[in-house]
């Protein structure tokens, strides 16, 4: 097969008329759009949003999946930044209804924006014995996208320090990562540390070593009755920023109680009801949907999730892709621990059921 020759159909995970997931053997291959490339998928990684979106916003025929790695096979005429044959990874956001009916990562082929793709480093580029494989790279798309918006978007935490321009201080500013052992949490901790901040985190005691290995200066048991007080004591009452990777009633309460008296900023990765966010007027909350960095309208049919097109967030992402790519090339980011799912796309369907049941600290990855 040449880079421009494709089969007439593909295998892909889709929803049936009842909203159930199945592997379709004759699914359409997404057409190439301006500014996009088509990738032959090698591996995919599972996220909670993969099963939540198909459960809460079912569409018969919808494709599923966000995180992927693979090889570029087709490039739109207006794209000159990448060539067929390049090994890449990223996030194929399918939150809008029209996009969900045409494209998803849990398939043999996936369509993605060229300006938001990351490249697998070559052996010549790798430093510090970097060994980012296609398998490991599949875990990074959503985590990196979410961290990009959560940490640096002006309406989120709005931090000024970045890995290439860290904040220099004898006493680094603390930032709480609630759920530090999640796939987003472990990446956020590393980016915060590299940006000159003092990342602290909550998680289960069984994950303390993992979270510390990623750069957290202190870790707290999320289930402790006085966890907020412990965080407040540790930070000397000067915690201004909290990234909540769990985003439930308990996590909101802990983050809000730990944030300093003058207030601060709180970012959730799930919708939080207004009555919970109104606990403290001095805290500025924001619900981050990483799909916003595509710069396109998000239409799911529910006000809490629907978003207008936001070119500023797309530009923020594009401006920072190079920085993150250089970090990847230098081996400066450790991927989340993985667990391989056997069975290809059929294994993905089973894996989503298992993920919904909880108890999976490792990132579930399948080779397509």
Curated annotation (Swiss-Prot):
EC number(s) given by UniProt: 1.-.-.-
Alphabetical list of InterPro entries matching this protein: ADH-like_C, ADH-like_N, GroES-like_sf, NAD(P)-bd_dom_sf, PKS_ER, Trans-enoyl_RdTase-like
Pathway stated in the Swiss-Prot or TrEMBL entry: Secondary metabolite biosynthesis
Coiled-coil zones: none
GO terms, molecular function: nucleotide binding; oxidoreductase activity, acting on NAD(P)H
Matches recorded under CDD domains: enoyl_reductase_like
Positions annotated to bind NADP(+): 49-52, 204-207, 222, 269-270, 360-361
Sites where the protein binds substrate: 135-142, 290-294
UniProt keyword annotations, A-Z: NADP, Nucleotide-binding, Oxidoreductase
PANTHER family, sorted: HYPOTHETICAL OXIDOREDUCTASE (EUROFUNG), TRANS-ENOYL REDUCTASE APDC
Chain's role: Trans-enoyl reductase; part of the gene cluster that mediates the biosynthesis of wortmanamides A and B, reduced long-chain polyketides amidated with a specific omega-amino acid, 5-aminopentanoic acid (5PA). The PKS modules of TwmB are involved in the synthesis of the polyketide backbone, whereas the non-canonical C domain of TwmB is a bonafide condensation domain that specifically selects 5PA and catalyzes amidation to release polyketide chain.
Subunit note: Monomer.
Family stated for the protein in its record: Belongs to the zinc-containing alcohol dehydrogenase family.
Name of protein: Trans-enoyl reductase TwmE
């Amino acid at each position: 097969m040449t880079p421009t020759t494709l089969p007439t159909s593909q295998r892909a995970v889709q929803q049936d008329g009842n909203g159930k997931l199945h592997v379709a053997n004759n699914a359409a291959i997404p057409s190439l759009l301006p500014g996009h490339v088509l990738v032959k998928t090698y591996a995919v990684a599972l996220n909670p949003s993969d099963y939540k979106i198909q459960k809460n916003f079912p569409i018969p025929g919808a494709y599923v999946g966000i995180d992927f790695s693979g090889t570029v096979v087709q490039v739109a005429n207006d794209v000159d930044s990448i060539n067929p044959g390049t090994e890449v990874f990223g996030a194929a956001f399918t939150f809008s209804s029209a996009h969900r009916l045409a494209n998803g990562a849990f398939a043999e082929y996936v369509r993605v924006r060229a300006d938001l793709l990351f490249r697998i480093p070559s052996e010549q580029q790798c430093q510090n014995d970097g060994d980012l494989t296609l398998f490991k790279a599949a875990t990074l798309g959503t985590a990196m996208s979410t961290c990009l918006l959560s940490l640096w978007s002006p309406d989120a935490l709005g931090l000024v320090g970045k890995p290439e321009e860290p904040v220099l201080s004898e006493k680094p500013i603390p930032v709480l990562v609630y759920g530090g052992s999640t796939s987003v949490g472990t990446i956020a901790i590393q980016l915060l540390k590299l940006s000159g901040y003092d990342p602290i985190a909550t998680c289960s005691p069984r994950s303390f070593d993992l979270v510390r290995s990623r750069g957290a200066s202190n870790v707290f048991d999320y289930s402790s009755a006085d966890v907020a007080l412990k965080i407040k004591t540790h930070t000397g009452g000067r915690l201004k920023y909290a990234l909540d990777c769990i985003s439930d009633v308990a996590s909101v309460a802990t983050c809000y109680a730990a944030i300093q008296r003058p207030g601060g900023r709180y970012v959730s990765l799930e919708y939080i009801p207004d009555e919970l966010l109104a606990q403290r007027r001095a805290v500025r909350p924001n619900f981050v949907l990483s799909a916003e960095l595509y710069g396109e309208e998000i239409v799911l049919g529910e006000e809490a999730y629907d978003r207008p097109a936001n070119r500023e967030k797309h530009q923020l992402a594009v401006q920072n892709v190079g920085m993150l790519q250089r970090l990847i090339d230098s081996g400066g980011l450790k991927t989340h621990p993985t667990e391989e799912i056997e069975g290809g796309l059929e294994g993905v369907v089973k894996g989503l059921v298992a993920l919904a049941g909880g108890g999976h600290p490792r990132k579930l990855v399948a080779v397509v």
